[in-house]
Structure formats: C-alpha cells, structure tokens
Amino acid sequence: MLRGCGEVGAVDCSPEQLNKHLKMVPGGRKHSGKSGKPPLIDQPKKAFDFEKEDKDLSGSEEDAVDEKTQVFDKHGKKRSAGIIEDVGGEVQNMLEKFGADINKALLAKKKRIEMYTKASFKASNQKIEQIWKTQQEEIQKLNNEYSQQFLSVLQQWELDMQKFEEQGEKLTNLFRQQQKIFQQTRIVQSQRMKAIKQLHEQFIKSLEDVEKNNDNLFTGTQSELKKEMAMLQKKVMMETQQQEMANVRKSLQSMLF
C-alpha cells in the first residue's frame, strides 16, 4: 500500500487508512495461528471432556474449570488489543516523522527558490544599470563631439562675416568686386548652412542608432533573463523531485527495515 503513495490513481495513504490497514494485520496473524495449532482454550475443554467420564467428579470441580477457561479468554483478548495499540502507535510516530521530513524539504526548497530569485534579480538589475550607464556615456560623448563641431562652424562663420565687413569697407569704391565678393560670401554661407544641416542630420541619425542599439540590448537582456529563469525553474524542479524521492526512500526503508 505505501509503495503507491503520491502516484496518480494510487490508494489513499492518509494516516487513518494506514492505521486501519495495520490494525487488520494482527487479526490476520491471530487467525493463521489458530489454523496451525488448536487454541489453548479448547485444550482444557478437551481435558475436561476426557475426565468427564469419571462419575465421581463433583459439581464444584466443574464450576472451577469453567471459571479458569473464562479468565484465560479475557487475558488473550487484552493481550491482542495491546499489540494492536502498540503497532498503531509506532505507525503514528512514523507518519509524524515522515510529515516532519516533508516540511523540512519544503522549507529548504523555498529558501533555495528565494536565493536563486534574489540572485537573478540582482544580476538583471546590474545588467540594466550597466546598459543605462553605457547609453548615458554614449549620449554625452555625442553631445560633446557635435557641440565642438557646431562651435567651430559658428566661429568660422563669424570670422567670414568679419572678413566680409572688412572687405566691404575697403572696397566701397569697387562695386563690382564687392558684388562678386558678396556672391562668394553667399555661396560660402549656403555651404556652411548645408554643413550645419548635415551635421544635424548626422546627430539625429546617431541618436536613433544609439536608441536602436539600446533597444536591442534590452531585448537581448530580457530574453537571457527568461532563459535563466526557465533553467532555474527546471533546476529547482529536478532538485525538488530528487529530494522528495530521497525522503520517500528513507521513509520506506525506515518503515520496512
């Protein structure tokens, strides 16, 4: 009966059913003992029947023999009831010990799950913080780089404007030359504007690339975390099954041996 405990479709292994089953065992042994050897109660009766042929046996002696047989029956019943109670108590103690072992295993499993979960969350938080720091460093680097480029372009533009003013003052009498220089300056300004526009577009594109890379990193980290959690769950389930099988083996060995 105990070998099927915990399996699907197995018999009920509750303490009440086990006590009921074990209480039935001494009765069966007592019955088999009766089949191999005649009970002691019948022996006095047979002796009494054998001696009954003596016609000198008095009525008081017959009463004494009957009282002895009744006392023997009472002691036999009390002894068998005591054996049943002792076996039931031992089984109850074994069941309580088995339940205590299961509770200890469950507590140990709970502690391991909490420890693995805390370690996984700590590792994931560290990865996220590292990604965030990397993103901030890249953004700061881009800001510094393009800020310097913008500043150099603006400084160059200011220098060009200063040259244009100087040339305008010097070439007031030379309209054609001034007109040519103006046209050249406009071309230069348009080129500078194009350069600024290109730098701005490159800056926006770089920011988008950084965001895409960070999204990919977050996605990869999330998938790795899911894989780690799945492996952790599988590992915990395997350890739990092994621990439960070991507890069941110990309990069965202690009950059988």
Swiss-Prot record:
A motif (Nuclear localization signal) lies at residues 109-112. Detected in spermatocytes and testis (at protein level). Testis-specific. This is Synaptonemal complex protein 3. It holds the Pfam family Cor1. Its main location: nucleus. The gene is Sycp3. Belongs to the XLR/SYCP3 family. Composed of a long central coiled coil domain. The N-terminal and C-terminal regions interact with DNA. Keywords: Cell cycle, Cell division, Centromere, Chromosome, Coiled coil, DNA-binding, Meiosis, Nucleus, Phosphoprotein. Residues 23-66 are annotated as: Disordered. Residues 43-58 have a biased composition (Basic and acidic residues). Component of the lateral elements of synaptonemal complexes. Homotetramer; the tetrameric helix bundles assemble end to end into long homopolimeric fibers (in vitro). Homooligomer that assembles into fibers; the fibers exhibit a transversal striation with a periodicity of about 20 nm (in vitro). Interacts with SYCP2. Forms a complex with EWSR1, PRDM9, REC8 and SYCP1; complex formation is dependent of phosphorylated form of REC8 and requires PRDM9 bound to hotspot DNA; EWSR1 joins PRDM9 with the chromosomal axis through REC8. Residues 87-244 form a coiled coil. It comes from Rattus norvegicus (Rat). Residues 90-95, 252-257 are annotated as: Important for oligomerization and fiber formation.
